[in-house]
Amino acid sequence: MRDTIRTALCCMVIAPGTLWAVVRLGGLERGPLVQLLAFTPYVAAWSVLPAVVLLALRRWWLAGVALLVAAALAGAVLPRAVGSAASGGGVSLRVLTANMQFGAADAGALVDLVRERRVDVLVLQEYTPEAEVGLRAAGIDAVLPFHRTRPLPKASGSALFSRHPLAEDGVRENPGHFTQAYARITLPGARPVSVESVHTTPPAHLDNLNYWRRDLAIQPAASGDTLRVLAGDFNATLDHAALRALVSRGYRDAAAATGVGLSGTWGPYLGRNGRKPIPPITIDHILADSRIGVGEVSTHALPRTDHRALAAELFVPAIQG
């Protein structure tokens, strides 16, 4: 009887990790599981503990299951910390994306970061009329004189600033009603590249999930003659099947490709009155066309926003002949 109880308790220890691995590897996230899947890297780290405990207790077959679960989660997560992409040749394009949190981000600090990182293209989400005034006053036009913006109240606005002239530029609205500024940019000696400021509906409520999936699904694929870069707040991590499906359409995640894909870009978030502590997660991304090389990728703190800015140096294929 006691042995049966101990076995049942041991099964309970490995059950959460096992179910998590099944959902993650099977792309089965539904309802509130969508939010939970963002924390898969933390669960992957925790999953080693049950295996160690069960080995110490000599529960060999249960320990074997726990080790398989830990290995499966590690296989899903660790490649982001290793990287595999070589930068290759091409013309340098430095991209910076930042969510301004209802336009409150420190405009002066953002422009300073643009100068420091020698940014060629800046894409912004939650771009408000107040943010536009602040950036103009901070001197954004002197650094990135070409722009396409749609300042809107609260979280719906979008902006794209560039060191180089824009063509075929515009702003589109997602099903979830956030806007996305986009433009084709031509660097001297390089093929044209289309850059878009991505902002999808957050899956913070069950009512938003359909919009979230649709927002991700309608992002343009990287195919044909047009080189593409999608950068912004995707409100999804690489543990979400919907984002992995987008990446599979001709992109690679710049941070994951260079081994910094576990760097948190949102949080830690304390919630209202500090009662809901949420650890950092990686929901901001720069997705580069797989034909574009990827160099250094880094995150940067910005005052007055709960997102970190994400910077990447990309290498656009040169014009041949």
Regions found by a protein language model. Name each.
Residues L28-E29, R59, A85:
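Transmembrane helix-loop junctions in multipass membrane proteins, especially transporters and channels
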Residues M1-M12, L55-G64:
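N-terminal export and membrane-targeting signals
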Residues A8-L54:
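Membrane-embedded alpha-helical segments of integral membrane proteins
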Residues V95, Q101-R115, L124-G321:
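Soluble catalytic domains of enzymes that build or remodel membrane lipids, polysaccharides, and related
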Residues T40-A70, G176-H199:
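Glycine/proline-rich, flexible active-site/cofactor-binding loop segments
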Residues A56, G64-E116, V133:
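N-terminal signal-anchor transmembrane helix
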